[in-house]
């Protein structure tokens, strides 16, 4: 009888499993110079050598519309990136790491019910493809910390982080980057800035998030009157924006910390213009990533960090919070901070954070780690150093795909524990595509229209208007106002039902203090470390130390400090 039950269970399990369907390259359509190569040791009779061409797998069948996992069996002599297209629309780019033997790379694609075409098209080209496998996608919920990484963050920063977390996966915050400040009058309404006005002119709505740059705040000319005025105007906009309920988002195009060159690009990316050859690794002790505090590089770096921190402290005094994306596009070989190894970059990022937060006392910023797709894991400074993981993606004009493959790559890289944002873009990702593809970015932010910028114009009026008037896109008009917004902490942002059981710490914990003391049935909200970082709903598996167990009793929050032996 037991054997029969086990057999039935096995049959039921097998019947519910989703098996991958394989599509061979030799049966696909090749174009642009790609060619078939007959060979042994592969899945079928050969493989496709794409060179500078493309491959299209026709007849890819999906039983129902939705998200599917796509595995590509490939070879590449060097790192390459190429486009993934589904039924003619761009689904994102795929990074193919160098490999001398056949290897797999996995991505996602949204398919329609019935027959589909999946294509790999040239961006860099020069890969070989044996086959692809397609199977239903297994989604996992996000579990994001209830508090920002900054210890003792300001009330404004906690509100901002909570707002991002509360809306992530449900709604996307609209943004716009600012460029030229010459048309903006110091102290005027931020809505009068040309880039902010651009959005209103196109859509009748203002962006909820406005990008600002410390572009002229460092370097040998930082104290020139025009440069200083540029930064002062950016700070003025941040103050007015926050007062109006919006979100300031800061980028820092950091110029040579030794003040030798008024540049942040390295020579190969300067297009004949001024460039810097500053090498921040000269600030390390030889053979390590430990800083030599007596080195010129270290002293120059720290002086610049302190200077930018002072602007944040000015905002902090006025109750203003913001988003900070330092050392952006990490791994891209065009800025001086990306010319060295991932380990060295991570040390630099940690220095920026530690100096600002622990030394200068900056407590009002939400921190962003912004790598290239290929470096998201290898350049990571550590999850305790950032709240948001973001990527910059510039699709072709009028390509409003969700870029789901990049979203899922970053979700997986963060183990579903970070807010994911599109921190720079050209055309906006259409809200319907984002929700259909389960790739709902926290915010998007087209680069500026001033300084002859073309990026906001890469979205047609109809798409601009339909998105900015969609309830799933947050505009400035939709913002609640920071004085009215209240923080609602829950253990995670998953779509699963919360645990309402009465949870107790494990038997190896000792209660130290409880505030306030309230009698009644308690429901565990979460376990937090002493810096307020959410760790889960049980102390099981946690190392020795002090933890805060947060419970809800009669509608009130009760915090108990436990020591785990």
Predicted features along the sequence, with ranges:
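Substrate-binding cleft of secreted/luminal carbohydrate-active enzymes
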Residues: 177, 418-492
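Aromatic- and acid-rich polysaccharide-binding/catalytic face
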Residues: 212, 376-399, 447
């Amino acid at each position: 009888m037991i054997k029969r039950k086990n057999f039935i269970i096995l049959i039921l399990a097998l019947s519910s499993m989703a098996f991958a369907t394989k599509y061979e390259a030799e049966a696909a359509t090749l174009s642009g110079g790609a060619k078939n190569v007959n060979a042994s040791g592969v899945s079928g009779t050969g493989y496709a050598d794409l060179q500078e061409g493309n491959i299209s797998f026709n007849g890819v069948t999906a039983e129902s519309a939705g998200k599917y996992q796509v595995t590509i069996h490939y070879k590449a002599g060097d790192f390459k990136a190429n486009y993934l297209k589904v039924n003619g629309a761009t689904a994102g780019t795929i990074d193919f790491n160098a490999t001398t033997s056949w290897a797999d790379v996995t991505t996602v694609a949204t398919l329609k019910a019935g027959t589909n075409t999946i294509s790999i098209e040239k961006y860099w080209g020069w890969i070989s493809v044996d086959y692809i496998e397609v199977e239903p996608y297994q989604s996992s919920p996000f579990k994001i910390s209830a508090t920002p990484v900054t210890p003792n963050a300001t009330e404004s920063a906690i509100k901002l982080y909570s707002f991002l977390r509360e809306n992530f996966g449900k709604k996307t915050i609209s943004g716009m980057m600012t460029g030229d400040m010459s048309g903006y009058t110091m102290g005027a309404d931020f809505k009068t800035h040309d880039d902010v006005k651009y959005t209103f002119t196109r859509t009748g709505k203002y962006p909820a998030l406005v990008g600002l740059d410390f572009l002229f705040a460092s370097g040998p000319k930082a104290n020139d009157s025009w440069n200083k005025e540029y930064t002062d105007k950016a700070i003025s906009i941040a103050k007015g924006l926050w007062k109006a309920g919006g979100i300031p988002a800061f980028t820092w195009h950091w110029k040579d910390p030794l003040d030798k060159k008024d540049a942040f690009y390295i020579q190969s990316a300067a297009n004949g213009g001024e460039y810097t050859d500053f090498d921040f690794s000269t600030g390390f002790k030889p053979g390590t990533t430990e800083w030599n505090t007596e080195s010129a590089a270290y002293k120059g770096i720290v002086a610049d960090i302190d200077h930018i921190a002072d602007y944040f402290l000015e905002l902090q005094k006025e109750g203003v919070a913001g988003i900070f994306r330092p050392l952006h596009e990490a791994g891209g070989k065009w800025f001086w901070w990306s010319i060295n190894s991932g380990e060295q970059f991570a040390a630099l990022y940690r220095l920026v954070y530690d100096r600002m937060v622990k030394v200068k006392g900056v407590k009002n910023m939400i921190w962003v780690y912004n790598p290239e797709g290929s470096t998201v894991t290898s350049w990571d400074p550590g999850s305790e150093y950032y709240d948001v993981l973001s990527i910059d993606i510039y699709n072709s004009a009028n390509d409003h795909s969700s870029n789901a493959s990049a979203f899922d790559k970053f979700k997986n890289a963060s183990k579903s524990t970070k807010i994911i944002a599109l921190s720079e873009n050209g055309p906006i990702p259409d809200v319907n595509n984002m929700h259909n593809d389960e790739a709902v970015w926290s915010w998007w932010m087209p680069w500026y229209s001033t300084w002859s910028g073309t990026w906001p114009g890469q979205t047609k009026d109809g798409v601009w208007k339909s998105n900015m008037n969609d309830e799933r896109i947050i505009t400035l008009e939709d913002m609640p106002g920071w004085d009215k917004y209240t923080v609602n902490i829950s253990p995670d942002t998953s779509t699963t039902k919360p645990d309402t059981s009465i949870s107790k710490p494990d038997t190896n914990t000792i209660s130290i203090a409880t505030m306030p003391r309230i009698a009644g049935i308690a429901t565990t909200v979460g376990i937090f470390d002493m810096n307020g970082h959410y760790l889960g709903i049980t102390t099981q598996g946690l190392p020795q130390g002090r933890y805060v167990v947060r419970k809800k009793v009669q509608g009130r929050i009760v915090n108990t400090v436990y020591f785990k032996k």
